[in-house]
Every structure is written in structure tokens, then in C-alpha cells.
Amino acid sequence: MNIRNDVQKALQHLFGRTAVPQETSKVNEALNGEKRLLLGKVLRLLGDQHALIQVGNQTVQGKLETQLRPQAYYWFSYEKKTAEQTGRLQVVQSFDQNPKTIQDAAGKLLNAISVKTSNAALMMTGAMLKSKTPVTENDIKTAVRWMDTLPSQDTKKAVETVLFALKRDLPIHSEILNGVHAVKSPVPLHQHVSQLLQAIDQNPQQSQMMSKLKEAVTVLLNSEIDVHAERLIDKLISLTDNTKAPSPTNTAGSRELSTPAGSPGKASLPIANHTAEQGSIQEEPVKTAADIPIKEARQLLVKLTESAEKNSLQIVKEAANWIKAAASSGDSKSLAASAVLQAAQVTDQEAEVFLKAVQQTAPHLADKADVLSFLSKVKTAIGARDEVAFIKAFEQGSAVTSGEMQSIKLALSALRASHEVAEPVKQEADQLFHKLNGQLFMQQDHPSYSQIVMSFPMFSKSGVQDMTVLFKGKKEADGKLDPSHCRLLFLLQLDTLKETVVDCLVQQKVMTITIETDFELQAAIDPMVPALKQGLKEMGYSLSGVNAKKRVHTEEKASIDQYITSISDQEVDVKI
């Protein structure tokens, strides 16, 4: 749960050295030997004409050349020679919260640091003053330069992005700001993925890096069919050897099952990377009553294994190819005639059995085990844990490396560092990269609670959408999250209800659910409440109620940023 803090520290270490040439965010180092302008808050007077000043998330001591008021804000000229213990503070500008005073102060300060007083720069600097957030000269210059790269219509959102970064003590660096800004954008994650794939396909010259990135994106797109393939193989194995359950062994991203009797002994069968979920899948009854003949099931498993070896594929990937062939075929005869099954010498009878097995093992995203397996594959394909690799690379000053199969994050990182990528591809890669990384900066980890944000682009046969989850929960004494006091917020795009927000608030294991849509749903929800109450009771929770709320329309679409802003400063027992 602390990965966001680890990433933030690594970024501060990295960007503290590289943010802006000749300038640094480390206040004490930056002020040695030269005069700087900075916005500071007087924390307290130390006596003997000295004061303790807060600048950003650090403090400096200085000798005063004029009288100051504690808890007031001033723009200081601060000069400190290397041999001196404390620097000299001279007030350049004091200000109050009068709008005209703030606007005038913003203009004077921009002139003092030789920054052009554009409307965007004035708006941003004025917002900093109004927010009473201590900042440095370097913060303003970096933020203004970053805002100059954005369209004018994004100025308001850009100011919000800068203030958000300052409030979270994030380094004011273009990469950080781009990440936060991307999360605030209403463009869904799945749209960025689709646009990137389209840009790669339309590029006439395909480089090795683009091929790797396309492969990583394809893995994401195939998440649901891979779950289907794993369930199909599990089904065939259980039929051919129903005397004992296959023993799972976790590997790097796959579960290995030993080859059943009658199958070639060379290949092992990598099935699923979620033993618990797959166990649940095996225990639940099939979705149709029709049985699959054991003889044909064994032959299919043998031919799948042989075909996978011949094509140098994992058996799951080979099974996925067979399922795709089944999806494009109308019946068992046309399936048997397909190139994929013909190459494996699958008979008409075996093709008919295979179609039946495909129908019985099809995943449903209303099923808990299927959803967990699907989301876990999406998370792995994106590279949700690859921040660890980024941290190590930052600390060691080396390039990010990975194994044979790259996640989207690692492939994006490698592609963005290349100078041999077409501009349309690079632009789409940048947007997706910032959208993914920006989620890290939305997370918070405090001694008493954690707030986690995750967005999953879901490419399914039932539709394409993002599922965004915001979790906020209290911590127990050992640092683990307390499931009896937490809050879960889901942002969904559903086929019928469209934009849907599900807000689950848990206090003392009592859950209150609020569902927000464009429709009046209370009458439709009420009959389902008893079953939900019973299900929660079995999990050790009670239900206080399910409330349907019709959305009040605004100009902007709902985004996770609204809800992060709404509850970031609230305890988990306070509702929106």
C-alpha cells in the first residue's frame, strides 16, 4: 500500500536534480551563495531578529531586515552565503486576501522573477497566493512553462493541477503535472488505449519498440478471452482426470498444471495466475447441464498441447486462438474447417465437443470469480506493480528493464525514451503514459488511513468501458487496512444505466450503499435488497440501506477527480 509514497520519494530524488537547469527544489541548497525570491509563511519569530519560514514542504531560518507578523505571508528576498548558518531575509511584498491586492502582487512577483505576465501566468500565480500555499520561484517558473505547452482552454484545469500538486507536496515538474492533469481529463483510459493501437497500425514503419508496445496492448485486449481459455483448459483437465484436482504452482504470471495421462510429456499447461479464484471456478457447477464426453475431452487436450508446442505458444494462448476461431464460426463443421483447427487435425466430432466446452466455460462479468480473474489480468497487462522497477531505476540512474513479456507501462517507458518513433505514435503514447502514472499521484498514504485510486480499461465482448475504483480506509495498529471502516467508490459506464456511481460506506461493518445514475431506480432496487442483505451477512457485514440518487446534471461529466477532491480531506465516516 506504500508504493505511491515510494514512487513519490523516488520522483522527488530524481526531479530534485533534473527539474530545471540551474535551479533546484531543495531550498537550502538552492539559496546558498545567491539571492532568490520565494513565497514563505512566517511560522514563528525566534528572537534576536531571526524567524522560521515555511517554504513549500521545508523550513528555513533567516535574519530579518524588517519586522514581520507571525502566521502572515510574505514574498522574501533571501540571501545566504555558504559559510553562514542562516541567511538574510528582506520583505519584497506582503499581501492580504483582497482580490485586487492578490492580482497586483501576482503581477509584481512575475515581473520580479522575469516571467512574462500572461493571463495564464497571472491566474496561476494569483491562485497560489490565494491558496496560501508556500512556493518557490522555481515552482512558479516551472508551472508557467508547463502551462504554456497546453491549449488556452485548459488553463483553469491546469491551475487546479498545479495547486493539487502543491497541496500533495509533489515536485513541480512537467512529468508530475502531466500525470495529474491527465487524470483530471474526461477522456477515458480505454479510449487512449484504442487511439494508441490505431496510431501504431497506421504507422508505415514498424520499429521493434512499437511491435513490443502493440504486443503489450494486445495482451490487455485479450484479457477476457485468456480467462475463457484458462477455464476451458481447467474444464478439460477436470474431465480427463476427475479423480484428483490439479495442484497449482505459482509461477511468474502463470499457473502450471502437469500434463494429464495420454498427453505428451514435454509441455506443462500454464493455466491461471489466481489460484484462489480458479479454485472457486472449479468448485462451481458448469453453466449448462450438458456433459462433455471424456474421450473427446482427452483428445482435445492432447491436440491443444501438441499444437501449442508446434506453434511455440503457451497452451492458454493456443486455446485462446481456438476460441477465437469458434467465435467466428457458425457451427462445428465450419469450425473444424478453420485453418487453426485443421492444422491441429481436429475432427468434426471433436469440434462439436469443443464448441460445447466453449459455451459452458464462457466467463460472465456478473460472476465474482470471473471478474476477479479478468481484472487481475488487466492489472498485470497494464503493469500496475511495475512502479517498483521504475523506483529501482530512478535510484540507480539506470534504464527500466523487464522480462520477456513487457507490460504496457514498461513498453510505453521504453518507447518514449526512443528518438526513432513517429510523432503520432509518440503523442498517443505520452497521453496514455501520463494517464496511467497520474493515478499514483492521486493516492494518499497516511499513518491513520490510505486512499487508493485504480482505473481499469475493460475490453470485453459485452462492451468497452473504464471501471474506476476509489478506496479510502482506516488503518489498524499493524498498518493493515481495516475493512470494518472504509469507503469504496465505483465509477462505471453501463450499457443501460450509462454513467453510474456506486458509493459504499462501511462503518463498524455496517454498509450504506448509494447508487447515482440519470434514472429513478429506487423502486427497481428495493426488491433486491433482502438478497444483498443476506449476502453481506454471510460475509460478516450488515446493510443499513441502499439509496438510489438521480444525478443533478452539470456541464462537466463526472470524473474520479471530483470524488477525490470531495473526500480527500474527510474522514471515512463522512459522506459526500
Curated annotation (Swiss-Prot):
Domain of life: Bacteria
Region (Disordered): 241-270
Residue stretches of biased makeup (Polar residues): 241-261
Protein name from the UniProt record: Uncharacterized protein YlqG
Gene (name only): ylqG
